[in-house]
From Swiss-Prot:
Highest taxon of the lineage: Eukaryota
Keywords assigned: Ubl conjugation pathway
GO biological process terms held by the UniProt record: ERAD pathway; proteasome-mediated ubiquitin-dependent protein catabolic process; ubiquitin-dependent protein catabolic process
A Pfam family recorded for this sequence: UBA
PANTHER family: FI07626P-RELATED (PTHR10677:SF3), UBIQUILIN (PTHR10677)
Domain Ubiquitin-like: 1-78
Domain UBA: 309-353
Gene: dph1
One GO MF term: polyubiquitin modification-dependent protein binding
Official protein name in the record: Deubiquitination-protection protein dph1
GO CC, any one term: nucleus
Purpose: Protects ubiquitin chains against dissambly by deubiquitinating enzymes thereby promoting protein degradation.
SUPFAM superfamilies linked: UBA-like, Ubiquitin-like
Amino acid sequence: MTNISLTIKAANDQKYAVTVDSESSVLALKEAIAPVADIEKERQRLIYAGRVLKDEESLKTYKIQDGHSIHLVKTLGQNPAAAATNVSDRTQQVPTNIQAGQGANNPLANLTSARYAGFNIPMPSASMFGPNPENPVPPSTEELANMLSNPMVQSSINEMFSNPQMLDMIINSSPHLRNAPPYVRQMMQSPEFRRAMTDPDTMRQMAQLHQQMGAAGIDPMSLMGGGLGGAGLGGLGGAGLGGFGGANNATAGIAGAAPVDQTAAANTIQNLLNNLGGAGFGAGLGDAGLGAGLGGAASPPAPAQDTRPPEERYAEQLSQLNEMGFVDFERNVQALRRSGGNVQGAIESLLSDL
C-alpha cells in the first residue's frame, strides 16, 4: 500500500494537506479531512474534475494521484437530535431575533439573500460560507428578478407568508409591524401581495420607472401620495402594478378593512422589506424602487447596472469554477447569476443539476 499526499482546497482560499492510502475510499478521505478542516465528514462534499466523489468509491476510481488537488464544499448538515425532530415541530420553534443578523438562528437567512433561496428547502445558508468576498456589492435588479423567477424561491416566499409562525416572527421583530393594525396581516396573507412579492416583472417595471423618474429629477413619492395606494401605481397587484384594491385605498380589496393611515401603512410595509433584507434582498428591492412603490421613504436612485459581459463580470468566479472542473461556460454563468455571483452558491446550483 502506498500513501499519497493531497491538497484539499476549501472556501476563502484555505488549503489543507492530508495523507491517505492510495486505495482508500472517499469516506476514509473525508475522515482524514475532518480534524484538519474542522468539518464533520457528513458535511463534506468533495469535488474532483467537476465530479462529486461518492463515499463508497475508492480514490483509484477517480484516478486521484499523489499531489492532486480536491475541492471541499461545506454542506448543510444535521446532528442526530435534530434529524429526529419532526419538521412541523421545528417550524413552530422559530426564533424571534431576526434582526440579530444572518446567522444560523435566522430562519429567513436562506430566503433573504440573492445567493440562496428557500425556507425549509435543502439549500445552504449564506452564513455557512461567511462573508462573500467575491460579490460584496448588493445584487442588481436583474439578479433579483432572476432569483424570483426560480420556482423554489416563489414557493419559499409563498410558504413563508402562509406560515402563521413565520408571519408572527416577522411582525413581532419590528415595532412598526408589531403596532400595525390587523389589516396589515390580512394584506400580507393575501394572494395579491404574494404575487407581487414573487413577480420578477413587477420588480423590473418598478426599477425602470424609478430610474426614469430619478433621471428626470422627479420624486416618485410625489406622484403616489406617500402611500401604498397612490395614484398611478396603486401599490401592488393587478397587472403587476395595478393595486391591491383601488387607487386611494390599499386595503379596499380586503373584506371589512377600514380606511387606513397610508403613511403608517407605507412605513409598515417598508419595514417588512427591511426585515426581508438580510444581505441584499431588501436592499435590492429598495434600490429597484419597489420599496418606494410600496410607499416607504424615498430610496436613493438605483446604482447603474453592470453591463459588462459575463466573462468580465464573473472572471474570477469563472476561473475558480473552471479549476474545479466545471467548464461549461453557459451553465457556469447561469449558476453565478442565480447565486448572485457567489462561487459556493453556484457550485451547489451546478451540482443540483447533475
